[in-house]
Structure formats: structure tokens, C-alpha cells
Amino acid sequence: GNYANVIQGHDNINDVINSPEPYLSRLIGRYGNRIANGRFQLHGKEYYLPINNGPNSLHGGKKGFNVKVWDAELMNNQSLVLHYVSSYGEEGFSGELKTTVIYTFNDDNEFIIDYLACTNKKTIINLTHHAFFSLAGIANPTPTIDTLECELNADFYIPIDETSIPTGEILKVEGTPFDFRKPVAIGKRINDDDNEQLKNGSGYDHCYVLNKKEE
């Protein structure tokens, strides 16, 4: 194989600010994915979040971590450390949240992201990174990912409703277009018009339950 840059991104902060894609390879918080109807309950109290995706709150709200300017420092020649303090009540979430993210590119050609967070009040949190991959390389991108093969060590997936909220079920992938236990081209079954889940997600936009041995 060839060495290539496979993660899409921006060259400077002005391109980030003016990007039409608000989540392109950005940090996501305080809560990645959707929260139904922009509300949640915690210890008997209900919290209300900004609605920014149909009837739901997505990726931390209208001004989530993806639009924040983080403090940055080099830890060594392999790691970049990012810091951000989310104030109490920011985007409707409880507690002040101090977040540290460490990007590491090591000698084994691994890119590792570590997330650390500390709050002064009970809250909910689901940090992630919204990387956009172009596996053929940024310099020579493929027009679609339909021909790329995917393999997932997962016997189950989580179905969603028509607004992309998990239904609470955990279903078997066997016999469905969601079965990637053996390598399959992504585009082979993505246009299955008879599959309600593919319609709900406009393709694959689901969580998988990865198989993992008990430690």
C-alpha cells in the first residue's frame, strides 16, 4: 500500500469558520449524536437543549464543541494537547465541564485520541471526533464509498426511528443489510428500498454493538 493523508480537514481556522460542513473532522461535545426532543432528565430535574436537527438536539447543540476555539499546546514531538472549559449551563447542560483532548501520532503510525473530562456537577457527556475519511487519499479521492469494503465484528446493531433516535431495541444483523461480519462493499445493499432502517438513516447512520471478549 501507499502512505497517504486519509482524513479530510481544513488548513487554517478561517476555512474552519467558513466551512459549509459544521462537523468536518471536528471534536464533538458535550454530547455526540442526538438527544430526543432536546431534553433529558437527571436526578429528577429536566434539562432543555437547543433544537438543531429536526425535533432533536444534535452533537451538543447549536454551539457545541465543534465551533469552539480550544487552547492548544505541544506535549512532545508526537502529541498535541487541547483544553476547553464549558461553562455551567452552556447549551443547556448542567455543571461546568473541563475537557482535555490529546492527539497522538506515534512511531507505529497510529493516530490516537484520548478524552479526559471533569465536571463539578452530575451531568451527561458523550465526547467523540467526527472524522471524515477518504481512504483512497485526500489527493485522489473516490467519487463515492460504494465500492469500498467494510468489515465489522458486530452481531447486533441498534435500530432508529424516522428522526434517527434509537428505538431502544438491539437487533441481530444476520439476514439484514447491516451484516458486515464478512467484508462487503458498502454500496452493495445501501439502496435496499425495502429496508425501513436504511430509509430512516438515509443509509447507514446506526450504532453497532461490537463483539468484545470479557477482560
Go through each PLM region and give its residues:
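An exposed, glycine/acidic-rich loop-and-rim segment of catalytic or binding clefts
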Residues: 1-215
